[in-house]
C-alpha cells in the first residue's frame, strides 16, 4: 500500500511557523541491478494504480511467456516478455493477482476484488495463452474484509481443486478451496489464521506447506497451510526490512531451499532471504539504467526458470510506484543478475 510522502512526514516542533523534515529511514546497504524491460504505463495516471504482477511460463517456448499486471482503478493487463501490451480486461477494484495452470491446458487468473470494501471477493478470469486475452470466469465471495493479498497453490498429492489464500486488510487469513464443475468455479472457505494488523504480500511454498504473509508494519509470517500455526520469521528492523513490507515472492531450489524476496517499500529496496530458514542474504535496488529506477514497490513476482534468451535464468518483476513523469508500470529484471550482485551461492 503506497503511502504518500512515506518517510518524509513533516513534524511540528511546537515553534510558531517552524517545522523540521524527518529524514527517511534507510536500511542496510543494498546492491543495485537495472531493468532489462519495462511495460507501458498503466492507463490510470497521477494515481496509485499499478499494483501486482503474475507470470505465466510457456514451457514449450519460454520466450513466449506472458505476464499479468493489475491497475487497481481499471483492470488487468497482459504483457509479453518484451513488455508489450497484449490485452486489457476492464475490471475496476482489483488489487493483487496470481495465476495457475489448471486441467485442459488452461490458465486460471485470480485477483483480489475490492469493489465491495466489506467483503473479500475473488475475481476470476481464464487466460488464452495463444492470444494473450482474458475472459471473465466469475467471482467467489470469501468472507468479511477488504481484499488485498492473494496467492494460490495446488493441493498436496491426492487433493482436489486449487487452494487460494486471501490476506485482507484486517489481518484475517482465509483459505479457499476452489473447484470447477460444468465450467463454473465455486469455493469453500475457512479461516486459516489471524495476524494483528494489515497484511498484503502473500506467497505459498507447496514444498514445505508454508504460507508466507507480509504484515505491513510488522514483518513476514510463516504460516502452516494446513493448521494455521504461525511464527514471525523476519521482523521489520529498519535494517533488512523497512516498513511497509509489501510484495513477496520465492525462487525455489531443491527440496526446501532457494530464496524468499520481499519488497521493503519504505526505503525502495528488496530484501532477500535464504530458504528454508529465512536467513537474511542481502538487499538490492533497481537503479537507473536503460530504463528508470524503481521506487515504492507494491507487488513483485519471481520465477527462476528459463525464459528464453532475454531471461535465461529467471525473471523478477517489480511494480514501479513512481515511474515519473509517466503513470506507474512494471519493470523486468534478470534474476541471475540479482544473484550475481548479491554474490549468492549458485
Regions found by a protein language model. Name each.
Residues 1-9:
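Bacterial N-terminal signal peptides that target proteins for export
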Residues 10-13, 335:
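Short linear sequence elements within intrinsically disordered, low-complexity coil regions
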Residues 15-18:
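C-terminal motif of bacterial Sec signal peptides marking the signal peptidase cleavage site
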Residues 20-346:
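Sequence/structural signature of beta-propeller domains
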Amino acid at each position: 500500500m503506497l503511502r504518500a510522502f512515506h518517510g518524509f512526514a513533516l513534524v511540528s516542533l511546537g515553534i510558531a511557523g517552524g517545522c523540521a523534515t524527518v529524514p527517511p529511514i534507510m536500511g542496510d546497504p543494498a546492491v543495485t541491478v537495472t531493468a532489462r524491460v519495462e511495460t507501458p504505463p498503466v492507463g490510470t495516471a497521477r494515481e496509485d494504480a499499478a499494483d501486482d504482477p503474475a507470470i505465466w511460463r510457456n514451457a514449450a517456448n519460454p520466450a513466449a511467456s506472458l505476464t499479468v499486471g493489475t491497475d487497481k482503478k481499471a483492470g488487468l493487463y497482459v504483457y509479453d516478455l518484451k513488455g508489450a501490451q497484449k490485452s486489457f480486461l476492464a475490471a475496476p477494484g482489483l488489487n493483487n493477482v496470481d495465476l495457475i495452470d489448471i486441467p485442459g491446458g488452461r490458465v486460471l487468473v485470480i485477483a483480489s476484488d475490492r469493489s465491495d470494501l466489506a467483503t473479500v471477493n475473488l475475481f476470476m478470469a481464464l487466460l488464452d495463452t495463444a492470444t494473450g486475452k482474458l475472459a471473465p470466469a466469475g467471482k467467489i465471495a470469501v468472507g468479511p474484509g477488504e481484499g488485498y493479498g492473494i496467492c494460490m497453490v495446488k493441493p498436496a498429492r491426492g487433493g482436489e481443486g486449487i487452494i487460494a489464500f486471501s490476506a485482507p486488510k484486517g489481518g484475517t487469513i482465509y483459505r479457499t478451496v476452489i473447484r470447477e464443475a460444468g465450467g463454473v468455479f465455486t469455493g469453500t472457505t475457512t479461516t486459516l489464521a489471524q495476524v494483528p494488523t494489515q497484511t498484503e504480500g502473500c506467497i505459498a511454498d507447496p514444498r514445505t506447506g508454508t504460507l508466507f504473509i507480509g504484515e505491513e508494519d510488522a514483518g513476514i509470517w510463516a504460516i502452516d497451510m494446513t493448521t494455521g500455526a504461525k511464527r514471525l520469521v523476519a521482523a521489520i528492523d529498519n535494517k533488512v526490512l523497512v516498513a511497509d513490507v509489501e510484495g513477496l515472492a520465492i525462487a525455489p531450489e531443491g527440496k526446501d531451499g532457494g530464496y524468499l524476496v520481499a519488497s521493503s517499500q519504505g526505503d525502495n529496496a528488496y530484501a532477500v532471504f535464504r530458504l528454508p530458514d529465512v536467513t537474511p542474504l542481502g538487499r538490492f535496488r533497481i537503479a537507473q539504467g536503460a530504463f528508470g529506477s524503481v521506487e515504492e514497490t507494491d507487488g513483485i513476482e519471481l520465477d527462476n526458470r528459463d525464459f528464453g534468451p532475454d531471461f535465461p535464468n529467471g525473471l523478477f518483476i517489480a511494480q514501479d510506484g513512481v515511474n515519473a513523469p509517466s503513470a506507474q508500470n512494471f519493470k523486468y529484471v534478470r534474476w541471475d543478475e540479482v544473484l550475481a550482485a548479491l554474490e549468492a551461492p549458485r
